[in-house]
Amino acid sequence: MKIFFAVLVILVLFSMLIWTAYGTPYPVNCKTDRDCVMCGLGISCKNGYCQSCTR
């Protein structure tokens, strides 16, 4: 059980790393620049979407 949990944690961490490095496959809606914090620092909200977070 511990091995399964460790593998699961590693998969989650790698998926989060890939998400932040390459953006998301779907547009991230936002109202202000603060809504785009999950995409990284300095990402701006334009036309209701986080620009650099969307592929």
UniProtKB/Swiss-Prot annotation:
Main location per the UniProt record: secreted
Entry superkingdom? Eukaryota
Q: Where does it reside?
A: Secreted
Query: Which tissues does it occur in?
Result: Expressed by the venom gland.
SUPFAM superfamilies per UniProt: Scorpion toxin-like
Record key words, sorted: Disulfide bond, Secreted, Signal
Looking up InterPro entries in the UniProt record yields: Scorpion_toxin-like_sf
Q: Which residues, by range, are in coiled-coil regions?
A: none
Signal sequence: where? 1-23
Miscellaneous comment in the UniProt entry for this protein = Negative results: does not show any effect on Na(+), Ca(2+) currents, nor on voltage-gated and calcium-activated potassium channels.
What is the name listed in the Swiss-Prot or TrEMBL entry for this protein? Neurotoxin X-29S
